[in-house]
């Protein structure tokens, strides 16, 4: 009897994980079930299955408290018998992308340093639509909702351009850029006013680093 019950439990678990396999890369809402020294356990969906948030998927600016509701990015579903696991994240760039996609589906690229700053490039296929304005929302309502969900993380919303040099100039926002010159394959030099140099580089190089990741250029 015990063997039968064990088999039934294993079958139910396998079916549950199989149902979650198509949730990879999606946003889910859950409750924090458990907090230990390293990992965070998050209860997901109606079936109350456990998702695990590893240290590298947590953001330094957030405090995780049992019972809190939060949205997580489903990073990976590993279905391997007793070692089956659903890995979720609050640090993945995909989290910011999915939060905005609930309102604005035209996101081209995202670069992120969790808990500090995100840069997101957007575009619109309709020239009559202000893509940045649609993303920000009336009086900043949409972007503020995402910022609040991310615990105050700064978000730069940038208009994507097919011209890589124009895109680089926009990606260095909030600094103004005088010119961008290509110096090699996927490499360029941006010239900024002297009084904007520190803004273009950012604290500990963060702004320049995020711009490079966003554009794929260095």
Residue ranges and their predicted role:
Residues 1-218:
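RNA-contacting regions in translation and RNA-metabolism proteins
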């Amino acid at each position: 009897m015990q063997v039968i019950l064990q088999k039934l439990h294993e079958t139910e678990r396998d079916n549950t994980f199989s149902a979650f396999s198509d949730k990879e890369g999606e946003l889910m809402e859950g409750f924090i079930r458990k907090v230990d020294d390293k990992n965070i356990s998050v209860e997901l969906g109606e079936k109350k299955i456990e998702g695990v948030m590893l240290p590298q998927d947590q953001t330094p600016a957030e405090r995780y408290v049992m019972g809190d509701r939060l949205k997580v990015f489903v990073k990976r579903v590993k279905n391997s018998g007793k070692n089956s696991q659903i890995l979720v994240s609050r640090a993945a760039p995909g989290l910011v992308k999915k939060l905005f996609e609930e309102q604005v589906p035209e996101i081209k690229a995202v670069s992120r340093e969790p808990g500090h700053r995100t840069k997101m490039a957007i575009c619109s296929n309709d020239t009559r639509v202000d893509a940045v304005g649609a993303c920000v929302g009336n009086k900043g309502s949409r972007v503020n909702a995402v910022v609040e969900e991310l615990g105050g993380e700064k978000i730069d919303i940038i208009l994507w351009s097919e011209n890589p040099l124009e895109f680089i100039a926009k990606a260095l926002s909030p600094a103004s850029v005088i010119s961008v010159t290509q110096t090699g394959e996927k490499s360029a030099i941006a010239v900024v006013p002297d009084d904007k140099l520190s803004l273009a580089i950012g604290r500990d190089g963060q702004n320049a680093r995020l711009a490079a990741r966003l554009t794929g250029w260095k």
